[in-house]
Amino acid sequence: MDTGGHGCSLSSLYVGDLHPDVTESMLYEMFSPIGNILSIRVCRDVATRRSLGYAYINFQQPADAERALDTMNFEVIKGQPIRIMWSHRDPGLRKSGMGNIFIKNLENSIDNKALYDTFSTFGSILSSKVVYNEHGSRGFGFVHFETHEAAQKAINTMNGMLLNDRKVFVGHFKSRQKREAELGARALGFTNIYVKNLHANVDEQRLQDLFSQFGNMQSVKVMRDSNGQSRGFGFVNFEKHEEAQKAVDHMNGKEVSGQLLYVGRAQKRAERQSELKRRFEQMKQERQNRYQGVNLYVKNLDDSINDERLKEVFSTYGVITSAKVMTESSHSKGFGFVCFSSPEEATKAVTEMNGRIVGTKPLYVALAQRKEERKAILTNQYRRRPSHPVLSSFQQPTSYLLPAVPQSTAQAVYYSSGSITPMQPDPRWTAQPHGPPSTCPPAASVVQPLSTTQHPCIHLRGASQVSSQVPHTQRVVNIGTQTTGPGGEGSSIPGQLLVPHRGTSAVHSAHGVQESAVYVPGHQPLTVSMLAAAPLHEQKQMIGERLYSLIHDACAPLTGKITGMLLELDNLELLLLLESPESLHAKIEEAVAVLQVHREMESTDRN
């Protein structure tokens, strides 16, 4: 097959319709018997790191790639047939639509393979696909031929033919923009109108009498249920667009039998859904723009604070348009929102109120973010964390480190008294300027050995002082690596996948892919997938047990209070703290400072 002239790589394949849990390792095991593989990459979402459902495989020899295309297409992986085609580096062919045809009214049993087999007689096929949703086939699909002539031949032969006793439509593919333009043109010349809010006694004859004054009608229909009762709406189809438009202008909002009619252009369900979705997105965007920079998120609220008290606390900084404490069964959930009239007022409130104690707790105040934005930020923080511990010159390694090659999947995270380049989460507590200095020295970029005469809140036990060791014997396979991130999914990056020999103690996910793990003495290794699999109420407990052990060694007198304060953070931020002793050290300092300020304020109030 001559693929080079069409922008295809002679040895690169596109593999689509992948199950979300399919990894590079699985694809390597499946395709490696065909021939030598240079690289495999599963494409993933930038924010969530979840599979997008397709991958690219580069073979060393073009003949191996062609053999894989011929023999492995529609093979089943994890209960789902895959779809293979040549990888097109130039998107022009796909976007032009040349040779691409659209087939609709397909019978439900026709799948990708059946569609491919049916149309392969007309020419070489680049790809074929039946569109599915959660309920099964949607009844239409696409076949992309290598040439326009083959596509035209398929249309001339198959359009109007029976496939599995169902007459199908076959035509040239049209882009969404072109279809919407044609739909808009048809909408301007509509003749069919929709009449809603009809009284139960209005039948076809009554409806015809109401609209006959506007012109000649082709059909009139009142929709009824299975019992023959009116469903309260119907359709009137005129011969001319002008007549239909006149009927809409005069009858919309008119009272008939005590009810106000709605009269408008009749729309198909897909068109109505598309318009409603567009309106919803427009309203959502307008709402986000309206509250951008003026809506504040307030966390760690005392249980005694209600809407009025929250508004009173923040009212000194400007005009508040709304203040709401989120509740569940009339009990405060510990957080709320305050919306100001201008961004300047909101910024001032964040600056002055973040870290201030209201009631018995220090507040966390920040600009409100949508859940998707917050998750994306935390995901990027997690991805930018150091790939391996950096040991300082004064410390000898207390565990085996993996070889110096890209090894994201096999990397376990260890604590030590040496330095780990910190990944600082956003601070949640800020001591007031008039408060006393912290008894804990500020965290530096390199953690130095600490003497036993210093404050008991500044010595973090090294979590690498555990017996679990990761062997350094690895077999290197030259395919893409998996970097495990939040949610247990990995990001595909060029490099080498490290496959450990049998008998290693590295932590594995449910799919056999190694994951980053947090080791704390006295506890099992903790991975992101283990955390995600646990119920919500157990996730905080799993993290809290490990935090308590580390905080107890650093600041025993205040262990319980500091642990409780840190558990107010999101789980992903807590994982960042567990992986970086410097970040945890900084958080402990902040918590101690806040508690000291609170203690002094209580002492002042008593005096």
Swiss-Prot record:
Keyword RNA-binding: yes
Knockout-associated phenotype: Knockout female are infertile, produce a significantly lower number of mature oocytes compared to wild-type female, and do not generate 2-cell embryos. Upon stimulation of maturation, PABPC1L-deficient oocytes fail to achieve translational activation of stored mRNAs including mRNAs for CCNB1, MOS and DAZL.
InterPro entries: Nucleotide-bd_a/b_plait_sf, PABP-dom, PABP_1234, PABP_HYD_C, PABP_RRM1, RBD_domain_sf, RRM2_I_PABPs, RRM_dom
UniProt keyword annotations, A-Z: Cytoplasm, Differentiation, Oogenesis, Repeat, RNA-binding
One Pfam match: RRM_1
RRM domain span: 11-89, 99-175, 191-268, 294-370
Residue ranges occupied by any PABC domain in the UniProt entry: 523-600
Effect of G97D: Knockin female mice exhibit early embryonic arrest and infertility. MOS expression and activation of the MAPK signaling pathway are abnormally up-regulated in knockin zygotes
SUPFAM superfamilies reported in the protein's UniProt record: PABC (PABP) domain (SSF63570), RNA-binding domain, RBD (SSF54928)
Cellular location(s): Cytoplasm
The keyword Cytoplasm appears for this protein: yes
Outcome reported for the amino acid change (mutating R374Q): Knockin female mice exhibit early embryonic arrest and infertility
UniProt GO BP: chromatin remodeling; cytosolic mRNA polyadenylation; nucleus localization; oocyte maturation; transcription initiation-coupled chromatin remodeling
GO-annotated cellular components: cytoplasm
MF terms in GO: poly(A) binding
Classification via Gene3D superfamilies: 3.30.70.330, c-terminal domain of poly(a) binding protein
Main location: cytoplasm
Tissue expression pattern: Expressed in ovary and testis.
UniProt family annotation: Belongs to the polyadenylate-binding protein type-1 family.
Record's function text: Poly(A)-binding protein involved in oocyte maturation and early embryo development. It is required for cytosolic mRNA polyadenylation and translational activation of maternally stored mRNA in oocytes.
Name listed for the protein in its UniProt record: Polyadenylate-binding protein 1-like
Organism in which the protein naturally occurs: Mus musculus (Mouse)
